[in-house]
UniProtKB/Swiss-Prot annotation:
SUPFAM superfamilies: Rhodanese/Cell cycle control phosphatase
Function noted in UniProt: Catalyzes oxygen-dependent 5-hydroxyuridine (ho5U) modification at position 34 in tRNAs.
Alphabetical UniProt keywords: Oxidoreductase, tRNA processing
The Rhodanese domain, residue ranges: 124-218
Protein name, as recorded: tRNA uridine(34) hydroxylase
Keyword presence, Oxidoreductase: yes
Similarity field: Belongs to the TrhO family.
GO terms (BP aspect): tRNA modification
Biological source species: Pseudomonas putida (strain GB-1)
Catalytic activity: uridine(34) in tRNA + AH2 + O2 = 5-hydroxyuridine(34) in tRNA + A + H2O
Length: 310
């Protein structure tokens, strides 16, 4: 790869009794390796996306895998020319991906992992119910052909959607997917708890599918939303054509950028009529700072913070 920056999405469900104590040394390991991005720590494990040079990512992964609990931490890689994150952060959370249902624990029960090479055959089975576990704005960018869109705004809405629409006695085979594998893994644990028997999820998520399945064999339609400044990636993991509205976080395409309601860093057609005046003024000020820093060839104005956050 010619690109200078490696982007690594990583996670693992594993009991971390000392996750609070891990926060500071993990942050220091990121700083020592010049890694940017955000990692989440919780009792149930670790999750996040980070970026650095090849050497920096390898250094952080080596540090993580020095802990026997994280020796097999799952990670997917893609590449870009510029640093896609501004900050280096470690946050403490109740959940590394928030479902909001007590007792759901992938460390205790989880669905059947499906390797990317076997995914096409599974979802081509007419008896399989294929569910996209991501949020509505992510699904709008791209999804697998034939997948059901729950139209959820957050993952917290997923349990109610399942209860309202599906029955374990009628839906015998369920396959789920998400960006990097973590959300659908937790969703599979929830589904098993609700009585669904045959529950499958894409190992490594969409990003691993892009890595391993040739584009000519792909059943994916569109781009994949990613949680960094690239906004989306194509099947070949190159950066897509979408931008992101900094006010509402919604992805926006070229047509939406041409709208009279689009103002870079301030508003877009999805949010222009819902923003409060206070939010709009704050966004305008923020954008001015960004443009001024860029014109003076200075670091991004929100890029100075190194944080270990509770």
């Amino acid at each position: 790869m010619s690109q200078a920056i490696v982007v690594a999405a990583l996670y693992k469900f594993v009991t971390l009794e000392d996750y609070i104590e891990l926060r500071e040394p993990l942050l220091q390991a990121m700083l020592d390796n010049n890694v940017k991005g955000t990692l989440l720590l919780a009792h149930e494990g670790i999750n996040g996306t980070v970026s650095a040079t090849r050497e920096g990512i390898d250094g952080l992964l080596a540090w993580l895998r020095n802990d026997p609990r994280l020796v097999d931490v799952d990670h997917k890689e893609s590449y870009c020319d510029e640093q896609p994150f501004y900050r280096t952060k470690v946050k403490l959370k109740k959940e590394i991906v928030t479902l909001g249902v007590p007792g759901v624990d992938p460390n205790q029960a989880v669905g059947t992992y499906v390797e990317p090479k076997d995914w096409n055959a599974l979802i081509s089975d007419p008896e399989v119910l294929l569910i996209d576990t991501r949020n509505d704005y992510e699904v709008a960018i791209g999804t697998f052909k034939g997948a059901i869109d729950p139209k959820t705004e957050t993952f917290r809405e997923f349990p109610e959607y399942i209860k309202a629409n599906f029955d374990p006695s009628k839906h015998k085979k369920v396959a789920m997917f998400c960006t990097g594998g973590i959300r659908c893994e937790k969703a599979s644990s929830y589904m098993l708890g609700e009585g669904f028997d045959a529950v499958y999820h894409l190992k490594g998520g969409i990003l691993k599918y892009f890595e391993e399945v040739p584009q000519e064999e792909s059943l994916w339609d569109g781009d994949c939303f990613v949680f960094d400044n690239r906004v989306t990636v194509r099947h070949d993991l190159s950066e897509g054509e979408y931008d992101q509205c900094h006010a509402c976080r919604h992805p926006i395409n070229a047509q939406e950028r041409a709208s009279e309601h689009y103002s870079p860093g301030v508003s877009c057609p999805h949010c222009w009529d819902t923003l409060s005046e206070k939010t709009r003024r704050s966004a305008i000020d923020r954008q001015k700072q960004i443009e001024l820093a860029k014109a003076r060839n200075l670091p991004h104005p929100i890029g100075y913070n190194y944080k270990a956050e509770a």
